[in-house]
């Protein structure tokens, strides 16, 4: 521990030198070498100082924070390297840019020191995670495990012992449900208007069922208690199922908003009123991205994926406070604005890529088909802009299948042919809805064809998935009731875990989903830094 803290202290001293003119590429290499030594030693000792608590269903929050900080330091090193190179080429200093990334590195180093100290204390005191440290999915599992244990005990106990069973679990189950509702309401705050009310009502139902279950703890009728337990379980699954659907709705809307309103628009806003609306829309979308990321972390089973999503969210959160002023004053500080905009686009690209990896393809298609069916049903009453929006949402599916891991689900010949048909009809729909002379009948006809092709594509994915499941069938470790109800989860849990085991570098190189017209972003992503930066990325791979 002392050796680790000593290396971090040296890192802090080097960070202080980075803001001055002496902070050139040699200084950055010195910092990278020191941090590399620290990361190598930490990687060797982390299993000793950071035990897991498997009974709680997750890793320790301090360990996850250390992983996040390591990834953030590497990200900021890459951006500092780019900043120094731009300064050298233009012979013009960018102190604000340096300070932005140095402050982030400094915060991460200080946070690593704090987390290492916390891990040392936890190990000495045998502490465990609190409910505040659990994700939505982990809390759901805890609540369902409590109910499952209650049901099993209920079947094997006498009425006189029933009161003791409930008193033992009552306080913790109620607290778990309260934390589940907090997560759900935090998401509801940024959800689409159509989903906010439903989520709020489902939260109220869950709280009501939980209160009934706990208030009747003195009830000695096992049959009555079982019905109350089943009602609470149904309320939990009802909230989880709808939250999944609302999350997919939000992902469609959020990605379309990113395409329609790129951050670069803030550079050339024509007037203050238009700028104010752009900033408001930008802030709303950033809040939505944060909540999408939080739930993506909850559903992901791979710690590498969790860490990279957290890193993207951390980068976007730190940029949120400074990128708008930087773009609005880009005439005075062009390099500062360019570097921050590049960094923002890069992080958004990685984030979108990871979200598409986590989402189950069939669930995404199902969600879009529901929205498309509603759009077709109300086609006559809806304005042309709504038709354009639903077709643009179809482009999210096009983006989804650009990833090799998702395209591989179309391995059957029919799947690839239907994917080609989908791309063709989607482009036709976009042309029709974009035309000022588009007739409602023509629009509806194209949308119906799009629906038909996507429904067939979904069937092809199902058929391919069933073939793989039949060839590798195994006996599950959960009850049949739990297995059936867990099928409502629409994200990573429904995907093969083997598809997730890919390194950080490979995710950023081979699985991009940029707009084909936007070559600048894809080129910048594939840019390699110096050898030290590459070695850091390699050594910080999380096992």
Swiss-Prot record:
Transmembrane segments: none annotated. GO terms for molecular function: actin filament binding; beta-catenin binding. Its main location: cytoplasm. It is found in: Cytoplasm; Cell membrane. GO terms for biological process: cell migration; cell-cell adhesion; cellularization. It is a peripheral membrane protein. One of its GO terms (cellular component) is cytoplasm. The keyword Membrane applies. InterPro entries: Serendipity_A. Keywords: Cell membrane, Cytoplasm, Developmental protein, Membrane. It comes from the Eukaryota. Required for the cellularization of the syncytial blastoderm embryo. Involved in the localization of the actin filaments just prior to and during plasma membrane invagination. Sry-alpha together with nullo and bnk may provide auxiliary functions, by acting both to stabilize a large and dynamic microfilament structure and regulate its functions. This is Serendipity locus protein alpha. The gene is Sry-alpha.
